């Protein structure tokens, strides 16, 4: 059974399709974010499906791999180092690959050969306080490192490009899921570049959600808050938990990743350009699931519904018309 999202009871919304500039006097729509109840037993069988996961040897990637594998999928784990002994599922193959290398990523996809589901999960944290002054041996301001940019943004874009290319050529559709971050919506002041990049990954999902469905390809994101992985080991997570703050397990986030790849939706997040049918049942697409402690929340639909409020009614109407004029489909 493919999990199908059921909307919570919310006040009636005024959708963009009915907006006109003279509606500025109308009461703005109200909406609450949609809570999700995701259970592993709701994941359908995935026998015969091939899943590729970057950063798949540990943390969220490995947790998702084990869930996919229990559903019957064949898994390819792309990473710089193999999983610890005994942690990878039996029906998985490790492929050594640096996500910042186009050549290595191409070779990894070629070795997998076929792709039904692609999870762009590899990521690193900021290696330095980016906007503090550091100096070289001559006392000159030192150029900062760009690993967080290369891995988290460039690598994710390259991985996604290759995945979409394979899915288009195969002609059988597919699903792309990107591991973003809660910091993409609520930035951390001590992680400014990391937060900006994760916001950019959410932007990538928004930019592609209207075009990829032409090929029966969906794209979604998961936005983990504090999660116990190598980026947030237990000795750091412990004080958060002791203070009563929510911390997620890698398994919980991994389950959101798998759900995002297989679920269906009763309506689109929003229409774009020439589109005029919002209530269209289809694959889960263009959405982000926030994972916070043991709670799942879908963010994008309500943000889209409230666009006239935060973007402006007139701005929304005119932008919609501009998009329709430039819509190449």
Swiss-Prot record:
- InterPro entries noted in UniProt: NAD(P)-bd_dom_sf, SDR_fam
**From the record, what ranges are coiled-coil?**
none
Carbohydrate-modified residues: 91
Indicate the secretion signal residues: none
Transmembrane regions: 238-258
The active-site annotation reads 194, 198
The record's section on Pfam families has: adh_short
Q: Name one GO molecular function term.
A: oxidoreductase activity
Outcome of gene disruption: Reduces the production of PR-toxin and leads to a large increase in mycophenolic acid production.
Question: So what EC number does this one have?
Answer: 1.1.99.-
At the top of the EC hierarchy, this enzyme's class is: oxidoreductase
Instruction: Identify the metabolic or biological route this protein is part of.
Output: Sesquiterpene biosynthesis
Can you tell me which residues bind NADP(+)? 58, 60, 81, 98, 121, 161, 194, 198, 229
- Topology term for the membrane: Single-pass membrane protein
Q: Which UniProt keywords apply?
A: Glycoprotein, Membrane, NADP, Oxidoreductase, Transmembrane, Transmembrane helix
Q: Where is this gene product found?
A: Membrane
What's in the GO CC field? membrane
Cross-referenced PANTHER family: 3-OXOACYL-(ACYL-CARRIER-PROTEIN) REDUCTASE (AFU_ORTHOLOGUE AFUA_6G11210), NAD(P)-BINDING PROTEIN
Q: Which family does it belong to?
A: Belongs to the short-chain dehydrogenases/reductases (SDR) family.
Physiological role: Short-chain dehydrogenase/reductase; part of the gene cluster that mediates the biosynthesis of PR-toxin, a bicyclic sesquiterpene belonging to the eremophilane class and acting as a mycotoxin. The first step of the pathway is catalyzed by the aristolochene synthase which performs the cyclization of trans,trans-farnesyl diphosphate (FPP) to the bicyclic sesquiterpene aristolochene. Following the formation of aristolochene, the non-oxygenated aristolochene is converted to the trioxygenated intermediate eremofortin B, via 7-epi-neopetasone.
Name of the protein in its database record: Short-chain dehydrogenase/reductase prx4
Which organism is this protein's natural source?
Penicillium roqueforti (strain FM164)
